[in-house]
């Protein structure tokens, strides 16, 4: 056996000895997350309103709109509205990946039709209409669908004479829709 074969066989042994790395899905579905001093149970983090319990750290972890509304209104104590969704990819945008594929994977990842959730709930017996964006949906950038959701929330608040609360988790307009995202 020559020296190249020995190196290749040694490499194969090392590969088989190393366990497979966890996928993003495995990490997302885990009961644990990490912060300043190592692993933290997600249950403990949730009890502390998604802020690291370590006194020196106090890092605010990213939360999605549902988690935010659970904190704001109480667990599942609000009504989620289905908002109108305009046509996907009006400009037929493609760069390294098509915009339709990006939307499809963002919808699968978040379980939302667009990057903004519109709800109605009560705080101290005051009815409130609220919207919140989800950073996991294409960086919470605004497009026509998010604009429609935002407008729907405002119209609902005006019609029902409720305060309107907007929680933004990102910024900017989505380049894949160009000026359409501004309308």
What are these regions (language model features)?
Residues 1-183:
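Terminal-region recognition feature
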């Amino acid at each position: 056996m020559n020296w190249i074969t020995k190196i290749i066989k040694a490499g194969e042994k090392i590969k088989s000895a190393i366990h497979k790395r966890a996928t993003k899905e495995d990490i997302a579905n885990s009961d644990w997350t990490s912060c300043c001093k190592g692993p933290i149970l997600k249950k403990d983090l949730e009890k502390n309103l998604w802020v690291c319990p370590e006194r020196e750290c106090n890092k605010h972890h990213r939360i999605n709109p549902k988690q935010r509304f659970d904190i704001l209104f109480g667990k599942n104590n609000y009504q989620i509205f289905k908002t109108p969704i305009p046509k996907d990819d009006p400009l037929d945008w493609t760069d390294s990946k098509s915009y339709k594929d990006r939307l499809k994977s963002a919808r699968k990842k978040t379980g939302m039709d667009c990057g903004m959730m519109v709800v109605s709930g009560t705080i101290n017996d005051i009815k409130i209409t609220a919207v919140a964006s989800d950073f996991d949906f294409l960086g919470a950038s605004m497009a026509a669908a998010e604009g429609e959701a935002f407008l729907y929330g405002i119209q609902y608040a005006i019609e029902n004479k409720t305060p309107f609360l907007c929680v933004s988790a990102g910024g900017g307009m989505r380049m894949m829709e160009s000026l359409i995202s501004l309308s």
